[in-house]
UniProtKB/Swiss-Prot annotation:
NCBIfam families: gatB, PRK05477.1-2, PRK05477.1-4, PRK05477.1-5. It catalyses: L-glutamyl-tRNA(Gln) + L-glutamine + ATP + H2O = L-glutaminyl-tRNA(Gln) + L-glutamate + ADP + phosphate + H(+); L-aspartyl-tRNA(Asn) + L-glutamine + ATP + H2O = L-asparaginyl-tRNA(Asn) + L-glutamate + ADP + phosphate + 2 H(+). InterPro entries: Asn/Gln-tRNA_amidoTrfase_suB/E, Asn/Gln-tRNA_Trfase_suB/E_cat, Asn/Gln_amidotransferase, Asn/Gln_tRNA_amidoTrase-B-like, GatB, GatB_C_1, GatB_Yqey_C_2, Gln-tRNA_amidoTrfase_suB_CS. Keywords: ATP-binding, Ligase, Nucleotide-binding, Protein biosynthesis. It comes from Rickettsia bellii (strain OSU 85-389). Allows the formation of correctly charged Asn-tRNA(Asn) or Gln-tRNA(Gln) through the transamidation of misacylated Asp-tRNA(Asn) or Glu-tRNA(Gln) in organisms which lack either or both of asparaginyl-tRNA or glutaminyl-tRNA synthetases. The reaction takes place in the presence of glutamine and ATP through an activated phospho-Asp-tRNA(Asn) or phospho-Glu-tRNA(Gln). This is Aspartyl/glutamyl-tRNA(Asn/Gln) amidotransferase subunit B. The keyword Kinase does not apply. The lineage of its organism: Bacteria, Pseudomonadati, Pseudomonadota, Alphaproteobacteria, Rickettsiales. Its EC number is 6.3.5.-.
Length: 483
């Protein structure tokens, strides 16, 4: 468990998260309007979205199905009876004067998700609920010095709000939870998890306490838009609360915003309670009643989920838990790996995928779907290493050319004459030459200077242009030098 260190001792973090995930749907939750990101302002707005008088909402069945599948992925209870409520508040980008949400009877509740901790153990985070609600529009304050404008394109887009219990004990655990949840949503296909575009947003409820004490007063940090900022925002807010308490002041329950530039939270408004919103069932919408048949059908349609894949990669492919988790975290990377793993050594493939391919993709700020190297060609590169056609060092050169051009590994090796030298007769000739040219080093090595062995290996590699088989060079050198 992580602690906040202060002059008076250690303080514990107590953190709960609320994740707002936009449902990947072509139309909105209660209207047929489109949901394309970055469309021109107010180009995807129906009379329902604009709350014109007499317009009635019609529930999008697909959004309901996506919420159910997400709930099943969270090992949660899917409620066969759920109700939409009106959450009443006024804001300029909420044309109805209320938000349609689910307060009393959510569609999903009582789920769990396991996350890795700093000790390497798994920790279970309880999911209180997942409910459906509509997103608000967007206020635009940078278009004019005199006016604010409203874009209702986002108004009415379906959201899943996923609420955890306050089981999270550090900023890093919060980040791990969000990363794992994002991965799950992408596998299920219910949300693309793109925090930069706002399709996944995080609110963090943060309080502090000394060990063994009751829960402290919590503050909510709204709309955190990146994994890194989740850590920064929670760290700052917790430290702020500790400083207040140690100075004899009280923590006021409030809603904050995090400023990514200053790294600080600032008060947005006092924290509302449920009573402030005057929730009541929406009279325009019938309760959602689900059958066992539908729930079972959606459960059967779920793909292999991240935890299942990790177990498979460990047992079937022999990967380490770490390697399996890194690959499975990105669904596209997992598909790429599985396609290539049928053609080569999975362990060696995983090593190259994580250390070389992911590294190059990060440098290029590219996704694996944009990679010019096909899974089949990547597997062929690994096979060339496996059968000693090329050395690991040469393979890195070949890989870099493949990444830039998309050329097949065998063609690059052939064109550039990079085949590894594994002929003992050829290597013995080179080794004899190295020994002949370096009598002092030979004498020093035989006199006990073992580190000189690396010098001889380096000389052989230099003379062969790095193409000598390293393992065979080591073996032959030891024979020649009598070690």
């Amino acid at each position: 468990m992580a602690y906040i260190e202060s002059n008076s001792g250690k303080w514990e973090y107590v953190i709960g998260l609320e994740i707002h995930a936009q449902i990947s749907s072509k139309s909105k939750l209660f209207s047929g309007s489109g949901t394309t990101f970055a469309a021109s302002p107010n180009s995807q707005v129906s009379y329902v979205d604009a709350a014109m008088p007499g317009m009635l909402p019609v529930l999008n069945e697909y959004c309901v199905h996506q919420a159910i599948k997400t709930g099943l992925g969270l090992k949660a209870k899917v409620n066969k009876y759920s109700v939409f409520d009106r959450k009443n508040y006024f804001y300029a980008d909420l044309p109805q004067g209320y938000q349609i949400s689910q307060f009393y009877y959510p569609i999903v509740q009582d789920g769990t998700m396991e996350i890795p901790t700093s000790t390497g153990e798994l920790k279970t985070i309880r999911i209180n609920r997942l409910h459906l609600e509509q997103d608000a529009g967007k206020s635009m304050h940078d278009q004019s010095p005199h006016y604010s404008f409203i874009d209702l394109n986002r108004a009415g887009i379906g959201l899943m709000e996923i609420v955890t219990e306050p089981d999270i004990s550090s900023p890093d655990e919060a980040a791990e939870f969000v990363k794992k949840l994002r991965s799950l949503l992408r596998y299920v296909g219910s949300c693309d998890g793109d925090m930069e575009k706002g399709s996944m947003r995080c609110d963090a409820n943060v309080s502090v306490r000394r060990k063994g004490e009751p829960l402290g007063t919590r503050c909510e940090i709204k709309n955190i838009n990146s994994i890194r900022n989740i850590v920064r925002a929670i760290e700052f807010e917790a430290k702020r609360q500790v400083d207040l308490i140690e100075n004899g002041e009280s923590v006021i329950q409030e809603t904050c915003l995090f400023n990514a530039d200053s790294g600080e939270t600032r008060t947005m408004r006092s924290k509302e309670e449920a009573a402030d919103y005057r929730y009541f069932p929406d009279p325009d919408l019938l309760p959602v009643i689900l059958s066992d048949e539908l729930i079972n059908e959606l459960k059967a349609s779920l793909p292999e989920l991240p935890d299942q894949k990790i177990d498979k990669y460990i047992t079937k492919f022999g990967l380490s838990k770490y390697d399996a988790e890194v690959i499975v975290a990105d669904e596209s990377a997992a598909k790429y790996f599985e396609e290539a793993a049928n053609e080569c050594d999975p362990k060696l493939l995983a090593n190259w995928l994580i250390n070389e391919l992911f590294g190059q993709l990060n440098k290029a700020s590219a996704e694996i779907s944009e990679c010019k190297i096909t899974p089949n060609d990547f597997a062929k590169l690994i096979k060339l290493i496996e059968d000693n056609t090329i050395s690991g060092k040469i393979a890195k050169t070949v890989f870099e050319i493949m990444f830039e051009t998309g050329k097949a590994a065998d063609k690059i090796v052939e064109e550039q004459g990079l085949v590894q030298v594994s002929d003992s007769n050829v290597l013995n000739t080179v080794i004899d030459e190295v020994i002949r040219e370096n009598p002092d080093s030979v004498e020093g090595y035989k006199g006990g200077k073992d580190k000189l062995f690396g010098f001889f290996v380096g000389q052989v590699m230099k003379k062969t242009g790095g193409k000598a088989n390293p393992g065979l060079v080591n073996q032959l050198l030891k024979e020649k030098l009598g070690s």
